[in-house]
Curated annotation (Swiss-Prot):
This protein's encoding gene: RED3
Pathway where this protein functions: Polyketide biosynthesis
Described function: Short-chain dehydrogenase; part of the gene cluster that mediates the biosynthesis of pyriculol and pyriculariol, two heptaketides that induce lesion formation upon application on rice leaves but are dispensable for pathogenicity. The highly reducing polyketide synthase synthesizes the heptaketide backbone of pyriculol and pyriculariol. Pyriculol and pyriculariol contain several hydroxyl moieties and double bonds, so it can be assumed that several reduction steps occur during biosynthesis.
Binding site for NADP(+): I16, S35, E63, N91, Y164, K168, V195, S197
Sorted UniProt keywords: NADP, Oxidoreductase
Top-rank taxon: Eukaryota
Phylogenetic classification of the source organism: Eukaryota, Fungi, Dikarya, Ascomycota, Pezizomycotina
GO MF assignments: oxidoreductase activity
Protein name per Swiss-Prot or TrEMBL: Short-chain dehydrogenase RED3
Similarity comment: Belongs to the short-chain dehydrogenases/reductases (SDR) family.
Length: 250
């Protein structure tokens, strides 16, 4: 009997998170753990996803501003029989409401964005570390954005999304720190492209596009392809654009 590959995806009820969940569930022998905000979150599409032989879906609840949800999620998956975690994809995130200009951005909006986009992924990693350490080749990826690239700011004018961009830059810093300090773990930062999700299409319109160029299915497959055989030597510590395979500047 084949050993199951266990994957955790945060923010998996919509957008690229849902796309990745569906793609993993369509592969045989995958336990796909999907985190959503709460029991009130609509998970109809997740539960309806086709499942290959030996694959199954587990739901856990992680609200990105909660300090205790990640630890409770670990307890829940262990109670369901999960004894290791092969892949952790920190996908959940968000943009501050209103997207205020840089010189109008208040501390509350900035702190909220850093909590949701940077601190929350770190808390999830901290909680699931023991299960990752039981995997043969554990991998940790964060879904970031070119908005978090300081070098790219002058080219793409990402300062028009100050709360989001600053938080993603913080996420990038933390993830590089994980790569350098945790030599047992393959860690990378992923930019999946400008994706046809609700926030992706909103961003596209802000820069004069009718819609984002990358479909959810393309983005999901790009991330999964990058992670399937990822090693520290091949992608560890890199800021990888999975839509075209390029390595992005920090």
């Amino acid at each position: 009997m084949s050993k199951s590959t266990t994957v955790l995806i945060t923010g998996a009820n919509k957008g690229i998170g849902l796309g990745m969940a569906k793609a993993y569930l369509s592969r045989p022998n995958h336990i796909v753990i999907c985190s959503v905000r709460s029991a009130k979150t609509d998970v109809t599409d997740l539960e309806a996803a086709s499942k290959a032989s030996g694959s199954k879906l587990l739901l856990v609840y992680i609200e990105s501003t909660s300090k205790t949800d990640p630890a409770k999620a670990v307890e829940d998956v262990q109670a369901a029989g999960v004894d290791h975690l092969d892949v952790l994809i920190a996908n959940a995130g968000g943009m501050p409401e209103g997207n205020k200009p840089l010189l109008e951005l208040g501390p509350d909006e900035l702190c909220w964005s850093v909590q949701v986009n940077a601190a929350a992924p770190l808390l999830v990693l901290q909680a699931f570390k023991p299960l990752l350490q039981k995997a043969d080749a554990p991998r940790f990826a964060v879904i970031s954005s070119t908005s978090g690239s300081i070098e790219h700011m002058k080219n793409i004018h990402s300062f028009i999304f100050p709360g989001y961009g600053a938080a993603k830059a913080t996420l990038n810093w933390l993830t590089m720190g994980v790569h350098l300090s945790q030599e047992w773990l393959t860690t990378l930062v992923i930019h999946p492209g400008l994706v046809q999700s609700e926030p992706g299409n909103w961003v596209a319109k802000q820069i004069g596009m009718a819609e984002a160029p990358t479909t959810i299915e393309q983005a999901a497959e790009g991330v999964i392809k990058a992670l399937t055989n990822a090693t520290r030597e091949s992608v560890g510590g890199k800021f990888l654009s999975t839509s075209d395979g390029t390595v992005l500047p920090w």
